[in-house]
Amino acid sequence: MGKKMEKKRAEMPPARAGILSFWDEEAPGIKIDPDYILYACFAVAVLLIIAHTMAAV
C-alpha cells in the first residue's frame, strides 16, 4: 500500500500530501484513522444539537 500512497502523493499539491501523510502506515508520529475523524465530527454535531436544545428550554 505504501507505493500506491507515494504515487498518489506525487500527483498532489504539497499541502494535501502533508495531510495525507497522517494516514500513511510509513509516516512517523501520530496515526489517525480517517474513520475517527468522521466519528469526531459526528460527536461534535450531536453535542451542538443537545446544547441548542438545552438552551431553548
UniProtKB/Swiss-Prot annotation:
User: What Pfam families would the database entry show?
Assistant: Sec61_beta (PF03911)
The UniProt keywords, alphabetically, are: Cell membrane, Membrane, Protein transport, Translocation, Transmembrane, Transmembrane helix, Transport
Keyword set includes Transmembrane: yes
Answer whether the UniProt record assigns the keyword Kinase to this protein: no
Tell me where it resides.
Cell membrane
Record topological domains on the Cytoplasmic side? 1-33
Q: Which residues cross the membrane?
A: 34-53
Its BP terms in the Gene Ontology are: protein transport
List the InterPro entries.
Preprot_translocase_SecG, SecG/Sec61-beta/Sbh
For membrane topology, the record states: Single-pass membrane protein
Topological domains (Extracellular): residue ranges? Answer: 54-57
Q: Which GO terms describe its cellular component?
A: plasma membrane
On subunit structure and binding partners, the annotation says: Component of the protein translocase complex. Heterotrimer consisting of alpha (SecY), beta (SecG) and gamma (SecE) subunits. Can form oligomers of the heterotrimer.
**HAMAP family per the UniProt record, alphabetical:** SecG (MF_00751)
- Role according to the record: Involved in protein export. The function of the beta subunit is unknown, but it may be involved in stabilization of the trimeric complex.
**Into which family does the record put it?**
Belongs to the SEC61-beta family.
Q: What is this protein called?
A: Preprotein translocase subunit SecG
What's the source species for this entry? Answer: Methanopyrus kandleri (strain AV19 / DSM 6324 / JCM 9639 / NBRC 100938)
